[in-house]
Amino acid sequence: MSQVYDSLSVPQGFQAAGTYSGLCSSRVKLDVAMIVSRRDCSIVTATSQGLMTQSGKVLLLHNGTALPDGPRGHEISQEVCQAAGKCMDEAPDDIALVASGAKGQYFRPSLLIHSLKTLTAGLGTDSQPLEAVLDNAGDVTAYQVALSSGTPGCSLSGVAADGTADSDGLCVIMTDAQAGSAVIEGALAQAKAAIDTENFTFIVMANGMAGNAEITAEGADFTAFMQALNTVTVHLCRAIAGDGEGA
């Protein structure tokens, strides 16, 4: 099936790239993405197992094979993040690894590590490589909104794709608004409550490059941020479901 990807620019301060690592033998499309922020950003990952939060500059996202549970998964994450840090001259703690896909499969971190130079060389402001990595069956969709109220110049860009019988759906949202992990968690929880997000993994990154005052858990700015995140999330998930309504 031929898939034509939307031409969507990522928010300011972000760059993205994608390549094929070969980690998942059943996947012939691009399977690993890199998103880099020019400055530290809040990274919130919400899965069916719970929430993970961290501050950093780099996200590595593999679609195809899930990390093993337990200590081995932690060891792989450390190994890949250390290699990425060395490749990019960043601290390993500033790098996040998310791997979504079939569980119980053999996971070769060396294949992700060998992809790092290709990813860093391909970084750009187009979302198409990220969309290609998320794509499972021609179902990928992208959407972008601008924030209103007291956050002029801020935007949110989202890319999502449905899951398969073996793996969760994926939704990645980037924003140049300045928002901490707690604010993102609160806004994301309200957005997820509006739709069926079971078996979906959400990743939200906020880098503050728009220069707005930090959004707190109360007030008009938080309301605008929550509404924007809700709009993007609902639009993407409904588009995947095929009802054509968006938000």
Task: Name what the model sees in each region.
Residues 1-247:
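A structural signal for small-residue-enriched, beta-sheet-centric alpha/beta enzyme cores
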